[in-house]
């Protein structure tokens, strides 16, 4: 499965780079940015196969999302070309921001898996128990992913203030606001999990709320257009 996953990620990379990288610059349409984010997500999830048994359920969703994102990028038309090849600071900011989003998305899938396992355990209708990961392990990996994503989002916000001259401009300020709100939501969630042992619906609600705010912050202007 790992070898097949690597081949799939390579094909995803080739397809996305052909759509994203143009002779006059980089084509940052919503479909292409989404395909790039899903590429980072698929690559990370595939490498995680080597260490985490808990990744099997999320992996199915990740690969399905990757296939759909590539298909949409190939079908969708549009042009939003920018040339950032010589702006190392901006490349770093965009890269770390997309990777943080990918990790938050994977953490969200883990939250769904955690909720499902918790419900099955309570109802005592859990089949194939030997094939499923322990609930505590899934919970620990969920916390680890969210913490790593939060750290990257912090770096993304700081680098955005440094490298984006219009970070607080009127036409861009909504991105800073929604992304900062997402940061606060995730910070509260992490504190609740670490200090007060939150789990179940409360954690899932925080994870969903954070993803919604972050999606609006990252892609809101593209969606409006």
Where are these regions (language model features)?
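Alpha-helical transmembrane segments
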Residues: 92-109
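Juxtamembrane boundary at the C-terminal end of a transmembrane helix
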Residues: 216-225
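A mid-sequence, solvent-exposed acidic-amphipathic segment
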Residues: 120-162
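Hydrophobic alpha-helical segments and helix pairs
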Residues: 45-94
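Interfacial loop-to-transmembrane junctions
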Residues: 191-212
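A generic, lipid-embedded transmembrane alpha helix
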Residues: 4-20, 41, 68-72
